[in-house]
Amino acid sequence: MAAGLCPGRALLSRRGGALWALLGTARGRAAGPETHFGFQNVSEAERREKIYQVFENVAEKYDVMNDSMSLGIHRVWKDILVHKMNPSPGTLLVDVAGGTGDIAFRFLNYVRSVRERQLQQKLRHHQNLSWQEISKSYQEEKSNPLGDSQVVVCDINKEMLKAGKQKAQHLGYSEGLSWVLGNAEELHFDDDKFDVYTIAFGIRNVTRIDLALQEAYRVLKPGGRFLCLEFSHVSNPLLSRLYDLYSFQVIPVLGEVIAGDWKSYQYLVESIRRFPPQEELKAMIEDAGFLKVDYQNLNSGIVAIHSGFKL
């Protein structure tokens, strides 16, 4: 597979059991340590199952709800993430919890644009060539518009991947793009595989964030970059109160009206409030081994982009 999967660490057993294999649980296994699901206290096993069910329920309306909840601003946040990444042709990206492909599609657009600019600059430097030679060179370069860049979208939820694949087909994305069912806490990729690891609005839904960060570090090449876009903690007290009011009073209602699912969006709101603040997440990223870790608040900390390097 183009994703560079480890054959020795097969994701699913031949006899099935895909959901339990991915969630890291099995019938008969001890429930494990206690954690939280929104404001509820649950076992780790129960949390994994509940979160899987949330995204199974919302997958079909996920993109519509993102636009409705954020008034479309999530698109700007994702654009900022990809511009911060600044990928060049040849970059190999893994987008974990990539679901419906928003980051992957932006990555491919960005790389294609960079590649086109490079080609135009190259042709301007060869003005002494005949038009036949210029045309031949242009056609050869155009045959590889991504410059060997690839993005692997990895998500634990098959319904989210299904929605992403359908969107990719509708929008015409295929080259340089692959989809993998996988768990952020136990990625089935080789060590030192990727140039960039992204996770956008996904890490707060990971039960063991420490394990996910360790896996991110493992699969990145030396010099590789970790980028995380996530809802965070608002620094402005007035905005924080207004944000809480909107989150708890409006978002679940939108979930019910648009997706027919109040409970899933109530969880999503609660999960944001239970997520570690910016400095705490920064420390966790550093504990996983990353260096030069920093973060950028957007919209007064409604979301933050954390960045770190494997050096």
From Swiss-Prot:
Intracellular or extracellular location(s): Mitochondrion inner membrane
Reactions catalysed according to its record: a 2-methoxy-6-(all-trans-polyprenyl)benzene-1,4-diol + S-adenosyl-L-methionine = a 5-methoxy-2-methyl-3-(all-trans-polyprenyl)benzene-1,4-diol + S-adenosyl-L-homocysteine + H(+)
Bilayer topology annotation: Peripheral membrane protein
Pathway(s) this gene product operates in, as recorded in its UniProt entry: Cofactor biosynthesis; ubiquinone biosynthesis
Residues that bind S-adenosyl-L-methionine: T100, D155, N183, A184
UniProt main location, coarse: mitochondrion
Transit peptide residues according to the UniProt entry: 1-29
Keywords: Membrane, Methyltransferase, Mitochondrion, Mitochondrion inner membrane, S-adenosyl-L-methionine, Transferase, Transit peptide, Ubiquinone biosynthesis
ATP-binding recorded as keyword: no
Stored Pfam families: Ubie_methyltran
Transmembrane as UniProt keyword: no
Gene Ontology BP terms: methylation; ubiquinone biosynthetic process
GO cellular component annotations of the record: extrinsic component of mitochondrial inner membrane
Chain's role: Methyltransferase required for the conversion of 2-polyprenyl-6-methoxy-1,4-benzoquinol (DDMQH2) to 2-polyprenyl-3-methyl-6-methoxy-1,4-benzoquinol (DMQH2).
Protein family (similarity comment): Belongs to the class I-like SAM-binding methyltransferase superfamily. MenG/UbiE family.
Protein name: 2-methoxy-6-polyprenyl-1,4-benzoquinol methylase, mitochondrial
Organism this protein belongs to: Gallus gallus
